[in-house]
């Protein structure tokens, strides 16, 4: 079974993810990203999709034109796990050059 992060683990791990915020009413984190155009946004999603498939851990996301909203939570654990932290860190590395979300 996948280990759901404790409150203390969650606090410690999220300190290293300043662009991510808690989702109200859920044990999940989210980040909104804005890219130069649709092609850049879709390229980002493709890179994340490949990593997510390797991890067997898939994000919830929403895309309109140059904007991508990502939510991470582990359904099997009913909350935030180390898998979510790992995928969030990967996303942060991939999108280090993005525009600030509007």
From Swiss-Prot:
Any GO BP: tetrahydrobiopterin biosynthetic process
Reactions listed under catalytic activity: (4aS,6R)-4a-hydroxy-L-erythro-5,6,7,8-tetrahydrobiopterin = (6R)-L-erythro-6,7-dihydrobiopterin + H2O
Superkingdom? Bacteria
What organism does the record attribute this protein to? Answer: Burkholderia vietnamiensis (strain G4 / LMG 22486) (Burkholderia cepacia (strain R1808))
Q: What is this protein called?
A: Putative pterin-4-alpha-carbinolamine dehydratase
The organism's taxonomic lineage, starting at the top:
Bacteria, Pseudomonadati, Pseudomonadota, Betaproteobacteria, Burkholderiales
User: What sections of the sequence does the record tag as coiled-coil?
Assistant: none
Keyword tags: Lyase
Q: Which GO terms describe its molecular function?
A: 4-alpha-hydroxytetrahydrobiopterin dehydratase activity
Which InterPro entries does the record match to this protein? PCD_sf, Pterin_deHydtase
- EC number(s) for this protein? 4.2.1.96
Q: Which HAMAP family match?
A: Pterin_4_alpha
Recorded family membership: Belongs to the pterin-4-alpha-carbinolamine dehydratase family.
List the SUPFAM superfamilies hit by this protein, alphabetically.
PCD-like
């Amino acid at each position: 079974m996948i280990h759901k992060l404790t409150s203390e683990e969650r606090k410690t791990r999220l300190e290293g993810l300043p662009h991510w915020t808690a989702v109200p009413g859920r044990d999940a984190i989210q980040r909104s990203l804005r890219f130069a155009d649709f092609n850049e946004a879709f390229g980002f999603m493709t890179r994340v999709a490949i990593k997510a498939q390797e991890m067997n851990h898939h994000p919830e996301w929403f895309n309109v034109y140059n904007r991508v909203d990502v939510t991470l939570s582990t359904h099997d654990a009913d909350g935030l796990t180390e898998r979510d932290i790992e995928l969030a860190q990967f996303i942060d590395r991939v999108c280090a050059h993005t525009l600030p979300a509007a």
